[in-house]
């Protein structure tokens, strides 16, 4: 049975391994998403320090990772489109599933955990974004109930200005 743990230093190597596998998969799909040094070990270390990253663990094995954030995302301030809600929201970022665990519902369980966290904290919605051509992620988002809202450009970091499709799920 899947359980969720707050990421800690004991998992950093596995987190980096899963991330590098995801980067290779995206590169193999011909996408530039996550190809400029993000997310990095330093990003995960800050997430661990901030307590905002969760691990999906089944039978002692880390199968997935996601960051859950409760502060406004600067990338979501301007959208070519319309958000489903106004005001406060939570967001999920850096969602990745370990090789060998894809297609087993891990992403769906991580999204469900994010929705539960958001509800517990009183947020009416969860937002997320992905590359316009990352069709596997877009399918996973649709399956989880996210609705496309428009296009955004990332703000800050090594992917500054990159185009993404923005999604929102009303809880």
Which residue ranges define each predicted feature?
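Conserved GNAT acetyl-CoA-binding A-motif
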Residues: 111, 118-130
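A short beta-loop-alpha structural element at the N-terminal edge
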Residues: 3-17
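Conserved beta-hairpin
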Residues: 50-68
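Conserved active-site alpha-helix within GNAT-family acetyltransferase domains
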Residues: 108, 120, 133-150
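Conserved acyl-donor/pantetheine-binding loop and adjacent beta-alpha core of acyl/acetyltransferases
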Residues: 67-96, 102, 155-158
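Conserved GNAT-fold acetyl-CoA-binding loop/helix
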Residues: 23-43
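Conserved acetyl-CoA-binding loop-helix of GNAT-fold acetyltransferases
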Residues: 97, 103-116, 139-143
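Conserved catalytic-core motifs of GNAT/GCN5-like acyltransferases
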Residues: 129, 142-163
